[in-house]
Amino acid sequence: MNSTLKVCINAIGYVVVFALLQVIMQYPVSAIYAYCMDVPFSLVINWVTIRPIELINEVIIPSTICAHILSIALFLLLKWTPISTRYISKKPYQVLGLIVLFSLFLVLPLAGIYELMGIEMDKNIEMLFNTMMQKPFGIIAVAILAPIVEEIVFRGALLRILLEYFSGSKAWIAITISAVTFGLFHGNLAQAVNASFLGLILGWLYYRTKSIIPSMVLHLVNNISAVVLTLSFSSDSDIKVVELFGNNLPLAVGCLTVSALLAFGVFMLIRKKI
C-alpha cells in the first residue's frame, strides 16, 4: 500500500469512527431509557431524532458523555493518538499560561467578527446547546470532555497522520485539511466557521510543539469561556456584542480592538517560545 493511500484511509477512518461512535451510543442509551420507562424503543429513537431537547437529560447528554469517553479510550488504546510525556517533561508552564491568556483575549474579537459576518446558529441547534450548557453533566460534556476528545481525534490522530505526508513547507496543507474537517464535523455553518478558524490555531500549536497539550489547553479555555458566557446571558441568547458595553458602539469597538491587539501580542510571544 503506497503512502498516499495509507494516509487517506487512516485519516478518513479516524473521522468516520469518531462520528459513528457519536451516533451509535445513542442506541444503547435510548434502549436503557425505553426499558426503564416502559416505552417502545422506536418511539424513543424518534424523539431523539425529531425532538432531542425533550430527552436531553435522559439520552442526549449521557450518550454524548459515553461516546466521548469511549472515543478517548479507543484512540489511546489503539495508539491512533500516541501518548508521550516528552512535552510536559519540559515544564512549559509559561507557554501554557500565555495560551490561556491568548484564548481569553480572543473571545470577544471573534464574537464581534462573526456578528459582523451575520453568521447565526440554527435556532433549534442553539436551543439544544444552550440547554445542555445549563445542565451540570452537559457542561462536563461540552466544556471538558469535548475539547479533550476533539484534540485527541483531530490533532493527535488526524493531523498527526496528515503531517506524515504533508511535511516541511506543506505542513499548512495538513493543518488546513484538519481544521476544515474539524469545522465541518460540527454540522452547522456558525460552528463550522468558528471551529475551522480555531482549528487552524490548534493545528499550528500541535505542529510547532508535536503535542496535543497546548492545543487542548486552548480548546478547554475556549469552550469553558463559551459556557460561562452562555450561562451569564441565558435569559437573552440573542444579545449582541455591543450590548455588553451598554450599547456604546465606540466603547465596544475600542475594547474589541484592544482585546484583539493583546491577543496578537500574546500570540507573538507564544510563537517565540515554542
Predicted regions and their residues:
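Alpha-helical transmembrane segments
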Residues: V7-Q22, G97-L106, I177
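Hydrophobic residues within alpha-helical transmembrane segments
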Residues: G13, V17, L145, I177-T181, ...
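Juxtamembrane helix-loop-helix connectors linking adjacent transmembrane helices
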Residues: Y33-L55, W80-V149, L159-E164, D238-L244
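Residues that define the loop-to-transmembrane-helix transition and helix capping
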Residues: F137, W172-I173, A190, I212-I213
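Membrane-interface helix/loop boundary segments of multi-pass membrane proteins
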Residues: V149-I177, W204-S211
